[in-house]
Amino acid sequence: MDITRRHLLSLAAAAAATAPIRLAGARLPKPQFAVHPFVEANPKAVFLKRTNVPHKMDEAAKLREGLAFARDVFVPMESAGIPVTHRVILKPNFTSVRNERPNEENWGTGTDPQFYEGIILGLKELGLKRFHFLEANNFHSWNYRGLADINDRHGVEMNEPDRRERNFRDGFEMSWTKVPDPVVYTRIPHYAPVNEPDTWLLNIAKWKAHGMCMTLSTKNVQGLVVKPYVRFCPGWKMVTGAPAFMQPDIHGKVEDRVNRYFENHRRLGYARYESSANLSPMNQEIWAHKTCDNSQVINPGLNIIEGIYGRDGDGFGVGQDHLTNLVMFGKDRFRLDMIGMYLGGHEPGNVNLFRIAKERGMLDTFNPWEVPVYEWVAGQPVRRKLSDFTRTPMKTYYLQKDGEPEYHLVNEPFDYDRVKA
C-alpha cells in the first residue's frame, strides 16, 4: 500500500479512537471462546447489524465497528467452546484492483481493511494468538488496500498460493477432503491448515455484485481451494478440459450429471437459461455445482458479509460503492447469501446456486421470506421482518437478456409456491 502523510494521520486517529473502546469494553480472556449462544442456537436465522460509518474511507469508524462486532458476537467461555489455543483461519475477500480510477473508487472490491482489523483485535482480546490468512487469488494485489500490512502487524501467517503439479502428488501444504455427494469434484484440495485438527474458520465476505450475480459468503470460501482447482467459473474447460493431473478428482459421470440438472432447469422454465452471455447459463450451472461440492467439506464457525459499503458492477474495476452501513452474519451461508442477494435488489429464486443447493439437499428453502431475520441491537437479537431493511440495488452483468442493459438487476418475480408444490 502507498503510505502517505494523510494515511499515517488517519491510522493515528484510528488508534486514538479505539483506545477508549478497548478500555471500556475489553473482556478478560478465558480458556475458550464461542459465537454468541443465540446465534449458535438459531443456525437457520440471519442476523443484521447496522453500523455508523459516515464515509467509506473513515478508518477510525470502520475499525471501531469491526471491534464492536467482535465484542458483540464472540464471547469468552470457561468450557464447551473453542479452545483459544486453536488456530483461527481468517478468510476475508481480499480482491483489490488498480486501474485508471483513483484507489478510493475501487475500495469496495473486497472486505473493508479496517473492519477486518477490528475483528482481529476483538479476537485477540479473547486470548487468541494463532491466526492464518488463506487466499488462492491475486497475490500481487494483496496489499493494494493495506490488508497484508494488517496481517503483518498482528502476526497473521499468510499462505503462498502457487503450487506445482508435484505438490499435489506430495500434498505439499494442502489438505485433501473427499466430497460426500459430488457432482463435479470428488476430492478437493484446500490450503493448509483448512480442515486440520484444532482449527476454526471465520468467513468474512464482501457485499458486492459479480458475474455470479453477487459474490457473498458461499463464494468467498472458494478462495480456500488450491489453484487451479479454485477455478470454478470457466465452465467445461476447467472440467473436461482441466489439466490431466486434476482428472482423477473429477466425477467420472460429470457430463451426464451436470447436463441432466441443466436440461431439467430449462424444462422447468427458470429465468435466463436462454442468455447468450459469456458467463453462460452452463458456466453458471457448473460454478454452482462446484460451489455445492466445496460447501460439503468447508464448515466456517461463522459467516459474515461486510456491507458497511456495498458495490455494484463486475466485482472488480467496474462498479460504484454505496454507503449502506450494514453487516450480515449467520451460521448457514446459503441462507445468509439469500438475504444478502435479496437486499441487493435481486430475487434469489432466479439464481442457479440456491435452487441447485436445495435440489442437492443443502437447503430446505430458497425463499428469502422463509428465513428468520433478526436485527442485532445493543448486543442482543431483535426479531424483524425482511421488509424492515432497505434494499440497495447492486446491478450485475449476470446472464444478460437480449435488449437488457449490461448491468441490471436479476429481479424477475419468482413463484416460490409453485416450486414448493
Predicted feature residues:
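N-terminal and secondary-structure boundary signal
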Residues: 2-421
